Amino acid sequence: MDEQRTVAAFVDDHDLDAPPEYRLLDVVSELGEVAKDAAESTDYGAHPDRIAVSDDELGDALFALLALADSLDVDAGEALDESLAKYEARIEASGAPNSGED
């Protein structure tokens, strides 16, 4: 995935290397910012049709996730392809993308 290589180069160029456990904390933190945008824009659920999330926050979360994948030596593109194939198989088998597990 080109985006993963771009993030990896940025991390390397700016000496931002970190172990996976810190990368995971960053992913969760950035997703919290996305959730905050969503919660605030909907007046904490009172107006769900008004949901808005800033591109910047989504970008931060994507950066963090791609940096995590790189720190784990996981090819994000391959992982996404595997996930899409899994969802496709579930839809074909049951008509729904979820696993059916509680």
Question: Residue spans of the language-model regions?
Answer:
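Flexible "arm" and connector segments at domain edges
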Residues: 1-58, 62-102
